[in-house]
Amino acid sequence: MVFSFRYLIISFLLVSSTIHSKDMEKLVFSEWNKPEINIFYRLPNKITENTKIIFVIHGNSRNADGYLNVWMKLANKHNVLLIAPEFNRSSFPSYNTLMMSTSSGRIRENKDLYLNNSIDLFFEHFNEKFGLEARNYMIYGHSGGSQFVHRYLLLSDNPKASKAVAANAGWYTFLHGAPYPYGIKNPPIELTSAHIRRFLNTEIHILIGSEDVKVDSSVNQSDGANAQGRNRFQRANNFFNVATDIVEENNLDFKWKYQIVNGAAHSNSKMSKAAAKILLKDLEEW
């Protein structure tokens, strides 16, 4: 009886420390047919039936913990579980295209590494791990993470994202006839009209910094990317306008928003502040 009682006390303490925390934590996710991946996360003060989930997708720097730290400060008073997967460079060099192609346009043949549906797999894992009742999630990505976000919402089977922010992407998959990854011609997986309709009818906020106009080695200069505009600012504007034209021509439902963040260049911290006003709106506070 003494052993059982001590065991129950220890178990309770372990559960309590897991469910009540404001510190960054990490797990190694291996429940798929791809290389294992580090996932950083931060639990709210207390998980309740109103706890929401926000995924934070890093840029090409791959510093998922740094991105999460920015959002921990922004969401410090909110009942939200923050999750930041780390797509390391060695295992997922082209995470920004969902591992479906290189940035120069060459299609990757190993479909086992494709990252469509990955976020929803993580979503289900965290829902089960912490006994959450979340039916959907929100997602933010900056730079390469912004590329990931919009392609993920386009090419995944049935993403449960209720709201998304794609900020300062270097280039896009336009909804026109250019070959994938620059357009939707000949994608490496099936892409139907239902995918496109759902994509356009998802609340996606395209954010671009007013000063994100610098062209350097970090900006994709391939022919396919340059056809989208000279810099990130032009490409974001053109991406949104092409989508708007398609919606008007085909009388489709459209929930996208376009926002210029004044004074911001290629800065995740500044774009995160703007995104937080969108994603944290109406969330429960402590």
Question: Which residues fall in each region the model found?
Answer:
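N-terminal signal peptide c-region/cleavage motif recognized by signal peptidases
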Residues: 16-18
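Gly/Ala-rich beta-loop-alpha elbow adjacent to hydrolase catalytic centers
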Residues: 139-141, 145
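The feature captures the conserved acid-bearing segment of alpha/beta-hydrolase catalytic domains
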Residues: 162-165, 169-248
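C-terminal catalytic histidine-bearing segment of alpha/beta-hydrolase fold enzymes
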Residues: 237-286
